[in-house]
C-alpha cells in the first residue's frame, strides 16, 4: 500500500474524531521519517515529500495544526 492510500484511509476512517485522524497521520509521518534516517539523500528527500503530503492532509482536517506543521517543515 502506498503513502497516498494510507493517508486516504486515515482521513476517511469512519467513526473517528478529528484528533484520532490527526494522531494517525502523525504516526504515519513518524514511520516515514524513521525510514529516512541514515538513508541515502534520495530517501531523505522522498521522506520530506511524504511529510508534506501528510501535513497537507492534516490541514484539510485541522487547518491550524496543518499550517503550523507545513510552516515548520519549510523553515
Sequence positions of predicted segments:
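Alpha-helical propensity feature that highlights long, continuous alpha-helices across diverse contexts
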Residues: 1-75
Amino acid at each position: 500500500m502506498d503513502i497516498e492510500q494510507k493517508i486516504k484511509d486515515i482521513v476517511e476512517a469512519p467513526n473517528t474524531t478529528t484528533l484520532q485522524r490527526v494522531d494517525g497521520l502523525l504516526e504515519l509521518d513518524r514511520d516515514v521519517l524513521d525510514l529516512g534516517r541514515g538513508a541515502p539523500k534520495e530517501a531523505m528527500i522522498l521522506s520530506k515529500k511524504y511529510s508534506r503530503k501528510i501535513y497537507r492532509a492534516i490541514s484539510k482536517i485541522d487547518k491550524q495544526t496543518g499550517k503550523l506543521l507545513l510552516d515548520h517543515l519549510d523553515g
